[in-house]
């Protein structure tokens, strides 16, 4: 199978002044550290502010996003984009499928129904080695890619709002 190549879109719409929410599941602390490092580096390089909210597992991420978005809106400090980070490693039961599919579905529903610029960095893997390969900034850097996706969606949202 050919390796997929992803090039960032060339939209130069400004994300200046943006405020990004990162919601991370700390079920695998060491892997999560790598995912978060990649996401934060990407956001810092774009010059945007970010806050981090931590939840126990991937299934809690969508609810935490809603809680945080609503609270920020009430304070008059809305978030412009969201990055979801977590790791789900396949085990011996159906739990992997439930967590993987339901967290992805809930994030998609949230993004579409609420118009949230969202990057999904919940990695779903069969082994710890696969998780590390996807989490490390020097390798596949899925945390950084999720932040980049959130910023790309924010740029599109801002550009379309001006059209």
Curated annotation (Swiss-Prot):
Keywords: Riboflavin biosynthesis, Transferase. (2S)-2-hydroxy-3-oxobutyl phosphate binds at residues 92-93, 134. The active site is at residue 95. The keyword Disulfide bond does not apply. CDD domains: Lumazine_synthase-I. One of its GO terms (cellular component) is riboflavin synthase complex. The keyword Metal-binding does not apply. Pfam families: DMRL_synthase. It is an enzyme of class 2 (transferase). 5-amino-6-(D-ribitylamino)uracil binds at residues 27, 58-60, 87-89, 120. PANTHER family: 6,7-DIMETHYL-8-RIBITYLLUMAZINE SYNTHASE, 6,7-DIMETHYL-8-RIBITYLLUMAZINE SYNTHASE DMRL SYNTHASE LUMAZINE SYNTHASE. Catalyzes the formation of 6,7-dimethyl-8-ribityllumazine by condensation of 5-amino-6-(D-ribitylamino)uracil with 3,4-dihydroxy-2-butanone 4-phosphate. This is the penultimate step in the biosynthesis of riboflavin. Belongs to the DMRL synthase family. This is 6,7-dimethyl-8-ribityllumazine synthase. The gene is ribH.
């Amino acid at each position: 199978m050919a390796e997929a190549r992803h090039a960032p879109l060339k939209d130069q719409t400004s994300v200046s002044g943006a405020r990004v929410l990162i919601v991370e599941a700390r079920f695998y602390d060491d892997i999560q550290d790598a995912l978060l490092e990649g996401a934060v580096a990407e956001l810092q390089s774009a010059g945007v502010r970010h806050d981090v909210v931590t939840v126990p597992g991937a299934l809690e991420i969508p609810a935490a996003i809603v809680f945080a978005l609503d609270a920020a809106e009430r304070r008059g400090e809305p978030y412009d984009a969201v990055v979801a980070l977590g790791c789900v490693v396949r085990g011996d039961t159906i739990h992997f499928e439930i967590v993987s599919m339901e967290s992805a579905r809930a994030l998609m529903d949230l993004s579409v129904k609420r118009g949230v610029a969202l990057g999904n960095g919940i990695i779903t893997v069969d082994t710890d080695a696969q998780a590390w390969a996807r989490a490390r900034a020097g390798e596949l850097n899925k945390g950084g890619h999720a932040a980049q996706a959130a910023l790309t969606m924010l740029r599109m949202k801002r550009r379309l709002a001006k059209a």
